[in-house]
Regions:
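Membrane-interface anchor segments at the N-terminal boundary of transmembrane helices
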Residues: 41-58, 229-233, 478-567
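Transmembrane-helix motifs of polytopic, lipid-linked glycan transferases
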Residues: 126, 236-257
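Specific aromatic-rich, kink-prone transmembrane helix
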Residues: 126, 130, 197, 289-308, ...
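Transmembrane-helix signature of polytopic, membrane-embedded enzymes
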Residues: 76-82, 162-164, 249-272, 291
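Membrane-interface alpha helices of multi-pass inner-membrane proteins
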Residues: 317-332, 343-344, 368
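Transmembrane signal-anchor helices characteristic of membrane glycosylation enzymes that use polyprenol
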Residues: 18-34, 85-98, 158-185, 368-381
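Extracytoplasmic catalytic/substrate-binding loops of multi-pass membrane glycan-assembly enzymes
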Residues: 180-192, 201-217, 225-229, 592
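Membrane-proximal stem/loop segments at transmembrane-domain junctions that anchor or position
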Residues: 385-513
């Protein structure tokens, strides 16, 4: 009697139909446009699909084949990654709604809009689930590419991986460095340069140590006879430090026996991604901060994951930890929020070895932290630094309050108005609130507000949270929608000196005409690169933030020891982004996530191989 196989029987047909429907949702999700083009539901859907039938058909077939293959090739291991895929699918839909501040999108405006949202949610959840399962399988199986042992370049890499990789990256950056002459900076650095020149007093809103270093660069320029040369020397020093850290990171990944594909891909990203090759030429406090965070991750990987004999007590380890911590604490005001949790987790990691081991582990990071506080105090005294605004620390609650005031202005009792007005200018909040950046709201912070006023304000903040939690959630989500969005291009470029006319004339900073022309061609080349497949993803904070969550889930499920310490830098960076002022066109806040995730992935690879052995 002929038997009906599971693949060709009724259940096989049902499974195949579901697989095809899911593949169609995945394909449609990639091309979904949430703009409502017509009030007619059929026309609205037709406008979204029109002209895309061929790519939709191709992607549907490809996804259907992948899904059928994944059923046997990539088994599900627990529910963690599935839940994460669903959450990321929902986040993707909301991110597409909130990612653009220039167009208003309503998901519930019509039945067709709601259908678009459902299709996109189902499709992206399935796409994320497929990607997560594939990555999970690659990590657990130890899938890698094999490279031949011969060749002069291969032998040089084995002998000097840090030197070779650092030199290669620096060579790739050379065109960007030349075109950036004499200097490129953002508005924050321009303000620091004006402080270093003495045009305005030093203030604590920007790290005073970084301002002092910029002053040294200007002093070097005076010695060399040109401010251009002094500022360009700073750029060169930053590029050399960056290449050295990246080379060292590649050597660390090799020590962890990271797969070839991970090392090669991360090196390519370091060489050609804007967060590296473009920003390494920019005087930007986030660049030395992120490079220092990368160096700290290297040291944590070698001491905690690789556990090289005697390395944790070596002088080289202590020096590199000190350089990393000082770089994080002196160039960014929030560096302490990363170093302290890392020190705490490091101490807890060795708690079974006794209190001496705990003190020794903590001292690696806490001693440089104390030294940085002494240095900052000295700089503050030497340059008479004006205290920064305390309101800088409350970006998120201020933003939530502003949205609540805009939404419920007439319903707020007089007593609550007065309490808010003691901290922020209540009457201005409704008009100046910008859902994507908290700076306009923070500018109304009253400098004379003390602890008493802030305590009363947070009491009102808590009451309003209970009154309309959705309002607070919207304020948080809109401002941080891009944090887990791998599709939207959210990259800022700083190509010009950015100085005020007064500062530029005083310094004599100028850019040759030929470099302006080359910069124009460089901008055209960027557009070409962003048109390449996967380039946007590999250069976006959202992609690496999602990868961070995947690594967290897998490490937790597999009980990979030491990963909590390794993930401190990217996780705390993500927390600070949520609490921070803005992410739109400010990808620099996420640089530590991009810089450190390849190392975290290499560490997880090492721990999974150790468990398997």
């Amino acid at each position: 009697m002929k038997t009906i196989s599971r693949r060709t029987g009724p259940m096989g047909l049902v499974t195949g139909a579901l697989c095809l429907a899911m593949a169609a949702c995945m394909a449609l999700a990639m091309f979904t446009d949430f703009t409502m083009t017509s009030e007619n539901n059929y026309q609205n859907l037709a406008d979204m699909i029109g002209g895309r039938t061929m790519p939709l058909s191709v992607f549907t077939v490809c996804f259907a084949v992948l899904l059928r293959w994944a059923q046997t090739r990539f088994p599900r291991r627990g529910r963690g990654l599935t839940v994460l895929a669903v959450v990321m699918g929902a986040w993707w839909v909301l991110a597409q709604v909130y990612a653009s501040r220039f167009r208003q999108i309503e998901l519930l405006a019509s039945a067709s809009q709601l259908l678009k949202a459902v299709i996109a949610f189902v499709g992206m959840s399935a796409l994320y689930d497929l990607f997560f399962r594939m990555l999970d399988d690659v990590l657990l199986r130890g899938t890698d590419v094999h490279v031949g042992a011969g060749g002069r370049l291969r032998r040089a890499y084995r002998a000097h991986p840090a030197l070779l990789c650092g030199a290669a990256v620096l060579l790739c950056w050379l065109p960007n460095i030349v075109i950036a002459y004499p200097v490129a900076m953002n508005i924050d650095t321009a303000a620091q340069v004006e402080q270093a020149m003495g045009l305005v007093p030093y203030d604590g809103n920007h790290p005073p140590f970084g301002t002092m270093v910029l002053g040294w660069a200007l002093a070097l320029g005076r010695v060399l006879g040109s401010a251009n040369l002094g500022l360009f020397a700073f750029t060169l020093a930053q590029a050399i430090f960056g290449a050295a850290v990246i080379g060292y990171a590649q050597a660390t990944m090799r020590t962890l026996r990271a797969p070839v594909w991970l090392r090669a891909l991360s090196l390519l990203v370091c060489a050609f991604a804007p967060c590296f090759c473009d920003n390494i030429t920019v005087l930007l406090k986030d660049v030395p901060y992120a490079l220092s965070a990368m160096l700290l991750c290297c040291e944590l990987a070698r001491a905690v994951i690789a556990q090289e004999p005697g390395y944790a007590r070596s002088a080289g380890h202590a020096v590199r930890c000190a350089v990393a911590c000082l770089g994080m604490l002196l160039f960014r005001n929030n560096g302490l929020g990363v170093v302290l949790p890392a020190a705490l987790l490091l101490m807890l990691r060795v708690r079974r070895e006794g209190w001496r081991a705990m003190l020794g582990a903590g001292a690696r990071l806490l001693a440089p932290a104390l030294l940085s506080l002494v240095i900052i105090a000295g700089v503050n005294a030497a340059y008479d630094v004006q205290p920064g605004s305390a309101g800088e620390a409350f970006s998120l609650p201020f933003q939530q309050t502003a949205r609540f005031v805009q939404k419920h202005h007439d319903e707020i009792p007089q007593e609550e108005r007065e309490i808010i007005d003691a901290v922020l200018d209540f009457e201005q909040l409704s008009g100046i609130y910008d859902a994507y950046i908290s700076d306009p709201v923070k500018e109304t912070y009253r400098l004379d507000a003390g602890a008493k006023e802030l305590l009363a304000y947070f009491g009102v903040w808590a009451k309003q949270l209970l009154r309309d939690p959705l309002c607070y959630a919207e304020a948080t989500l809109i401002q941080n929608a891009l944090l887990f969005d791998p599709q939207t291009r959210n990259v800022a470029f700083f190509d010009v000196p950015g100085l005020t006319d007064e500062a530029a004339q005083a310094l004599g900073v100028s850019k040759p005409d030929v470099l302006w022309r080359l910069m124009s061609r460089e901008m055209t080349m960027r557009e070409l690169l962003f048109a390449l497949p996967l380039y946007t993803q590999l250069t976006s904070v959202g992609f690496y933030a999602i990868l961070m969550l995947v690594v967290c889930v897998i490490a937790r499920r597999e009980r990979a020891g030491g990963m909590g310490v390794m993930l401190t830098v990217p996780v705390m960076t993500a927390v600070m982004i949520v609490l921070g002022p803005c992410l739109l066109w400010q990808d620099r806040y996420g640089f530590p996530i991009i810089y450190c995730m390849p190392l975290a992935l290499a560490a997880l690879w090492r721990q999974l191989r150790q468990r398997k052995a």
